[in-house]
From Swiss-Prot:
Residues 1-61 form the TGS domain. This is Threonine--tRNA ligase. It catalyses: tRNA(Thr) + L-threonine + ATP = L-threonyl-tRNA(Thr) + AMP + diphosphate + H(+). Catalyzes the attachment of threonine to tRNA(Thr) in a two-step reaction: L-threonine is first activated by ATP to form Thr-AMP and then transferred to the acceptor end of tRNA(Thr). Also edits incorrectly charged L-seryl-tRNA(Thr). Binds 1 zinc ion per subunit. InterPro entries: aa-tRNA-synt_IIb, aa-tRNA-synth_II, aa-tRNA-synth_II/BPL/LPL, Anticodon-bd, Anticodon-bd_dom_sf, Beta-grasp_dom_sf, TGS, TGS-like. Belongs to the class-II aminoacyl-tRNA synthetase family. Its cofactor is Zn(2+).
């Protein structure tokens, strides 16, 4: 007999060889039905793995994040199973879990398109209903190679060759087998709420020299209700797509002459200026001086900073006068050069610098996505040089600034996470202990709850991440606060301490909105293009019922502009209904409509974008009304 301890501290006795599914059944049939896998002494295992000794057991159900991930991973296998049934000559490659779903890459021998997805999905449902048990066997590497080679799965053979382990896991359901670390669900009947969503191309191992594979994306959920809710969200997201809205509102465009780099139009630049000016004022409030540094630097600087070894493939390089240069992928090294121009005392610290720095990264063309994934973007970078004793206080201020910014832009629901030390890192454990505790203390001081992400920090320091939730429930990673013990030392940054000796400052990297391009894309989708008044590219459209009001329209327009209102004058010889409809589609917050009565009484009639009639008032009163709304960031 063995003793199994449960999360509530209770201990129960079972026969040796029992599995987690049996344990779940002994508690309740419903729990057994919901069990996906289990943690046995902190190791994630299949639900049917035998337990032969005393242990601590935590059952994983579909309600747990790990359970949902396992469900989705098993659904990826179901997709591969269905594809092999329908297209037997297809080679399977990899099928990982991604946010809200999964994908699987295939090498098809025949042409396949979006129209084929319903057929594949139908086959998946047929296979799931078979309730085929899912099991695995562990075999020597050579045997696994022979197994997949015999099936003509050359990609699987290549994957196995690249793995150092001498033992391989092969999972089987019905007549389909796949290489996988697992764990997986007990049987296919659990898979009831899934949907194939799209098809795309993807190079094998992300290398454009390799074969272009077909990537099929899908989503999978614990219940059909959850699936329906997610699909509704996708439908709403499609309506909010910033690329479509950007075209309608004449904000920006992309073209093949400059892939991944936006062409900003007047309306888009107006939004950009509001975001940048707001951030500049926020930085001034928090004591940041503003700098501007070169986009191009000698390649030796990137070698010193470490970017050459880690980012070389993503950097744009050029030559001039027999020298190698690179366009910067990050702003940090050039910021350090500004710091290094002076001798600093500990009394000078902290030194806070901010920069709206343009960076370029050679992202794969297949990953580019409107403003959300580009090759050139402007980062609202901040870099703080301080003593170790000042770190906590500086982080407290940065957290406060982040919260203020997000709330002013209309993001009131966000999650905060701390990425902790990775396995490969610089610095001793004592330094990491102190650093991680400083970040925790800073969040505690702001009464912020947070999630810990073990192993996800950078090799040079832990970081705080801010994840914003938008109007339709999507989460966007936005700001970061990063401790850095490496770059100041690599680039020779120093200060003189109170004993007259040189010390290396701690460098804090902070980005609040991050990429301005991406943040504006987020704002467009969050508000579905109906930006709040203070951000709207055109705040008021002025129009007359007939051309008899043209002079008065011009007069009102000039008064609005003198009061700092971004107004548009529409004197076209069109019916008033047409003008109202057009400016409503353009998401202009307020429409000023002028007729004979308004002209004679020197008043204006105001209509909101929503269609609400605000009645009549003087231009001065309207300007005061708008100013109050703008100042309140409404």
């Amino acid at each position: 007999m063995i003793n199994i301890r449960f999360p509530d501290g209770s201990i129960r006795e079972f026969e040796a060889g029992v599995n987690s599914l049996d344990v779940a059944k002994s508690i309740s049939p419903s729990l057994a039905k919901a069990t996906m896998a289990a943690y046995i002494d902190d190791q994630l295992k299949d639900a049917k793995d035998a337990i032969n000794s005393n242990c601590e057991l935590r059952l994983i159900t579909v309600k747990d994040p790990e359970g949902l991930e396992i469900l989705r991973h098993s659904c990826a296998h179901l997709l591969a199973h269905a594809v092999k049934e329908l297209y037997p000559n297809t080679e399977v490659t990899i099928g990982p879990v991604v946010d809200n779903g999964f994908y699987y890459d295939f090498s098809f021998k025949e042409s396949i398109g979006e129209a084929d997805l319903p057929t594949i999905e139908k086959k998946m449902k047929e296979l799931a209903k078979k309730s085929a048990p899912i099991s695995y066997r562990v075999v020597p590497k050579a045997e696994a190679i022979e197994f997949f080679k015999a099936q003509g799965e050359n990609y699987k053979v290549e994957i196995i060759d690249s793995i150092a382990d001498e033992q391989m896991k092969i999972y089987t359901q019905d007549n389909f087998s796949d290489l996988c670390r697992g764990p997986h669900i007990p049987n296919t009947s659990v898979l009831k709420a899934f949907k194939l969503t799209k098809l795309a191309g993807a190079y094998w191992r992300g290398n454009s020299d390799n074969e272009m594979l077909t990537r099929i994306y899908g989503t999978c959920w614990a219940t059909k209700e959850d699936l329906e809710q997610y699909l509704n969200m996708l439908e709403e997201a499609e309506k909010r797509d910033h690329r479509k809205i950007g075209k309608v509102l004449d904000l920006f465009h992309f073209q093949e002459d400059s892939p991944g780099i936006a062409f900003w139009h007047d309306n888009g630049v107006r939004i950009w200026r509001q975001v940048e000016d707001y951030m500049r004022a926020s930085n001034n409030k928090y004591g940041c001086s503003e700098i501007r540094t070169p986009l191009i630097a000698d390649f030796s600087l990137w070698q010193k900073s470490g970017h050459a070894s880690k980012y070389a493939e993503n950097m744009f390089a050029t030559k001039s006068e027999n020298r190698d240069f690179a366009i910067r992928p990050m702003n940090c090294p050039t910021c350090v050069q500004v710091y290094n121009t002076k001798l600093h005392s500990y009394r000078d610290l902290p030194i806070r610098m901010a920069e709206f720095g343009i960076v370029h990264r050679n992202e794969p063309s297949g990953s580019l996505h409107g403003l959300l994934r580009v090759r050139s973007f402007t980062q609202d970078d901040g870099h703080i040089f301080c003593t170790p004793e000042q770190v906590e206080e500086e982080v407290i201020l940065m957290v406060q600034q982040c919260f203020e910014v997000y709330k002013d832009f209309g993001f009131n629901d966000f999650a905060v996470k701390i990425a902790l030390r990775p396995e490969n890192r610089i610095g001793d454990d004592e330094t990491w202990d102190k650093s991680e505790q400083m970040l925790k203390n800073a969040l505690d001081a702001n009464n912020v709850s947070y999630e810990l992400l073990p192993g996800e920090g950078a090799f040079y320091g832990p970081k705080i991440e801010f994840h914003l939730k938008d109007a339709i429930g999507r989460s966007w990673q936005c700001g970061t606060i990063q401790l850095d013990f490496s770059m100041p030392q690599r680039l020779g940054a120093t200060y003189i301490d109170k004993n007259g000796e040189k010390q290396v400052p701690v460098m804090l990297h902070r980005a609040i909105v991050g990429s301005l391009e991406r943040f504006i894309g987020m704002l467009i989708e969050h508000y579905a293009g109906n930006l709040p008044l203070w951000l709207a590219p055109v705040q008021v459209a002025v129009m007359g019922i007939s051309n008899n009001q043209d002079d008065y329209c011009k007069e009102v327009f000039i008064m609005l502009e003198k009061n700092g209102i971004r107004a548009k004058l529409d004197l076209r010889n069109e019916k008033i209904g047409f003008k109202i409809r057009e400016h409503t589609l353009l998401r202009v917050p307020y429409l000023v409509i002028l007729g004979k009565n308004e002209q004679e009484q020197k008043i204006i009639t105001i209509r909101k974008h929503s269609g609400e009639d605000l009645g009549q008032m003087s231009v001065d009163d309207f300007c005061a009304f708008l100013d109050k709304q703008i100042q309140a960031k409404e």
